[in-house]
Amino acid sequence: MEVLTKDEVLYHRGSLLTADGVMVASWDLEQQESFSGDYFSLAGYRGIRNAAAAPFSVDYCNESVVHIINGMGVTLGDSIIGLTALEALREFNPNLHTIIYRPGRAPHYVDQLYHLAAGVVADLRWLPWKAEHIPEQELCIDAGNQLFWPAFTTLPMIDFFLQALGVEPTAIPATAKANRWMQKLCLPPLPERWQNKPYVLFCPTASTPLRSIPASAHVPLVNALWEKFACPVLGFGAVDHPHYVDIQPFSTTTADFLAWVKHARYVLTSDTAAVHIAAGYDVPTTAFFTSIAPELRVRDYPLCQPVYFAIPELNNVQASARKHDLEQVELAFTTLMLNELPWA
């Protein structure tokens, strides 16, 4: 095996292996101030499969267990779709046992989702993990560092994850691609004030400023929601509008966030995590996209109406906080015709 350079270690299309056979996530090394030692590609070791290294297919009807190394991302949105892909494997085999080996340093709010899904979609373990502790005869797939796989930016995300698991996406019905496994999760109740009361949800903040709704558009959009639905507009953070309520203090966990989305009458957002959650709970949504084509994220969501600002120089840019890029996004929102917003 060839030793990876330090750059290759961080941007490797998959997971890593130490000289003594321990599986490691690039993400975990990146979170450290520094790292040392030799690292190799995990792909192929002890029969571990990696679709970025060599495409493969699996007949899950004949598998009893699958081990997923370094799945399914370190953001909330990616993780929801990755878990949807894992749940979809039960279309072939309802009794399939799935075990995910998570990066040990993933953000806490993301891992909270996996804890909610534990025993529902998959069982959990954490990297680093000795490869030899996984029985060699059992199916083992490396899904790590997917952000650096070429197909990640060109395929609908659910199709990407299915291919990474060795499944032809067309073999899975669209109804199994809409995150409805989330309806099995045990969530906390809303505060008493909002139980059984109608509200709409405004979620303007995405994981990167590039995909967030500019502050200058918050009040106009909250007002559009109020005029459309005539019920309180709830959201996360301050907005100066008489019919808006900041519920940030009442949403301190990922489970809280899911519950607020689940019970909303409608969601208006640029946060794809909120879009994926709303789809899982069949909540109608209008979703703004600034750099990612909507069909790559919401193709299978019949209750989602996308608004796409096609900004050529930002096409497929995953993240940015550069002043010029954010000015382009803000300019795009000034062209928005609020009376022509698409509603699901």
Question: Which residue ranges define each predicted feature?
Answer:
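Catalytic machinery of carbohydrate-active enzymes
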Residues: 1-344
